[in-house]
Amino acid sequence: MNPLIQSLTEGQLRTDIPSFRPGDTVRVHAKVVEGSRERIQIFEGVVISRKGQGISEMYTVRKISSGIGVERTFPIHTPRVEKIEVVRHGKVRRAKLYYLRALQGKAARIKEIRR
């Protein structure tokens, strides 16, 4: 990578990001702007993918809301996310859990592991 670009992006990287992987259940505290007000919205779900590296790294969180699957993709180092909490660690054998989109109910459960 170009040294100039690398030096610029190093200042933008966040250091308060917890360690999480696909299969983990996370609670994301995202800042939402509504008109002139700003509030925190909590989005809790299973991490189904993590992709990219450095400043452009992103993760996708999936949850079921009123029987409908909702997915949201967040950049890891964005200032729009106040904090990320890891609720539980899941045991999976894949890096991308896109197959969860086709599963419903008990079939979509992920076994918990102690870490």
Curated annotation (Swiss-Prot):
Keywords per UniProt: Ribonucleoprotein, Ribosomal protein
PANTHER family documented for this protein: LARGE RIBOSOMAL SUBUNIT PROTEIN BL19M (PTHR15680:SF9), RIBOSOMAL PROTEIN L19 (PTHR15680)
Main function: This protein is located at the 30S-50S ribosomal subunit interface and may play a role in the structure and function of the aminoacyl-tRNA binding site.
GO biological process entries: translation
HAMAP family: Ribosomal_bL19
Name by which UniProt lists this protein: Large ribosomal subunit protein bL19
Phylogenetic classification of the source organism: Bacteria, Bacillati, Bacillota, Bacilli, Lactobacillales
InterPro entries assigned to the protein according to its UniProt record, in alphabetical order: Ribosomal_bL19, Ribosomal_bL19_CS, Ribosomal_bL19_sf, Translation_prot_SH3-like_sf
Source species of the chain: Streptococcus equi subsp. zooepidemicus (strain MGCS10565)
